[in-house]
Amino acid sequence: MTPTGAGLKATIFCILTWVSLTAGDRVYIHPFHLLYHNKSTCAQLENPSVETLPESTFEPVPIQAKTSPVNEKTLHDQLVLAAEKLEDEDRKRAAQVAMIANFVGFRMYKMLNEAGSGASGAILSPPALFGTLVSFYLGSLDPTASQLQTLLDVPVKEGDCTSRLDGHKVLAALRAVQGLLVTQGGSSSQTPLLQSIMVGLFTAPGFRLKHSFVQSLALFTPALFPRSLDLSTDPVLATEKINRFIKAVTGWKMNLPLEGVSTDSTLLFNTYVHFQGTMRGFSQLPGVHEFWVDNSISVSVPMISGTGNFQHWSDAQNNFSVTCVPLGERATLLLIQPHCTSDLDRVEALIFRNDLLTWIENPPPRAIRLTLPQLEIRGSYNLQDLLAEDKLPTLLGAEANLSNIGDTNPRVGEVLNSILLELKAGEEEQPTTSVQQPGSPEALDVTLSSPFLFAIYEQDSGTLHFLGRVNNPQSVV
């Protein structure tokens, strides 16, 4: 169980190169040429050969209409099939998108904490957040389109179409990023990683979505659910209907907000992410065990444990340690533990920033007996709150030009990102005592029984799929 290092080193080199050219928190110099409109596309956009006809629109069916549930096995198989067909340029484009998504994810993770959402823990999916922003970019016109591209840390030159992001290329690359995560190869008996993304477009009655916009979102995920319902008469009831719909369609035990929607909204854009991974070689320990929330408070939680060869190192200067646990051939779980619980905020600020991967060392794997809580993390946040914290409260507000979304400019209410992340022990039985091979070094005991940070990383594209902190395994984030 050893995560490979070549792809990681290449990614670190790319990020070091990029970071060295960074001005402040924003980046304006990397070409990202594979993500821009090319000259021929720009010629068609600027000089259409035929007269532009009014775009076709449709009114979403009512939310109570009968709907088939999401089939996660089908979604997984579609991702695997698409990933197996990726060509070299597709992989390069995926790596470019991953790099930008990581950087935007770090900034928004910081906003998530500053908005006060990190008190009980935190979780954020950079690709899902990035996909949400790019979806709005596709639905926007200037000046909003340029403002969104600037938020995405990609330079735009006024009047230069070839400096504009091609949103279709970006969404397709984000789907490739998902495919590279779940396509792990290996033996057929290996439990696959599952990641499903669903988008709900909830509209007020009478609001008509453009077919072209919805079809573009299918590049990101085929699990699209445009639905209409009354958002103004009883906002609390509207929220309850949306939550019931999501539970019925997905079966996921999400942390869905109970607050009422804004009465003047005509569009809610909600993204739901479900990740499920199996930690091979781990088993659940009997009973429950103490997890210290702070120096004086503990809770009793289920724990899992396993012994294997993992990369592990300790940073004595900054007082934290890192353990890398493979989740597949190319996916790795990074577990970051401060040596002192009170240092969690400081270590988080030090680690979860643009140069995260430069902190990752590459020591030889060693025998580790790792024990940690069984993780089932639910989190939800409103992107509008993060934009407000980032001093962009009106970016998706009433003045935003989002007329490529529907027949009229929508009034965007909540923009939710909801996440359910499950990491469970493998099914194989483990011996009650560790079998020590003659002459082999004794396994180092590493126990995460106090707050820690985590990230899930896929090495081929260099994507950080999840960033998070666990303050209390029993709390909903």
Swiss-Prot record:
Keywords: Disulfide bond, Glycoprotein, Secreted, Signal, Vasoactive, Vasoconstrictor. GO terms for biological process: adenylate cyclase-activating G protein-coupled receptor signaling pathway; aldosterone secretion; angiotensin-activated signaling pathway; angiotensin-mediated vasoconstriction involved in regulation of systemic arterial blood pressure; angiotensin-mediated vasodilation involved in regulation of systemic arterial blood pressure; astrocyte activation; blood vessel development; brain renin-angiotensin system. The keyword Membrane does not apply. GO terms for molecular function: receptor ligand activity; serine-type endopeptidase inhibitor activity; type 1 angiotensin receptor binding; type 2 angiotensin receptor binding. Disulfide bonds join C42-C161. It comes from the Eukaryota. One of its GO terms (cellular component) is extracellular region. Residues 1-24 form the signal peptide. It is found in: Secreted. Glycans are attached at N38, N319, N401. In response to low blood pressure, the enzyme renin/REN cleaves angiotensinogen to produce angiotensin-1. Angiotensin-1 is a substrate of ACE (angiotensin converting enzyme) that removes a dipeptide to yield the physiologically active peptide angiotensin-2. Angiotensin-1 and angiotensin-2 can be further processed to generate angiotensin-3, angiotensin-4. Angiotensin 1-9 is cleaved from angiotensin-1 by ACE2 and can be further processed by ACE to produce angiotensin 1-7, angiotensin 1-5 and angiotensin 1-4. Belongs to the serpin family. Essential component of the renin-angiotensin system (RAS), a potent regulator of blood pressure, body fluid and electrolyte homeostasis. This is Angiotensinogen. It comes from Mus musculus (Mouse).
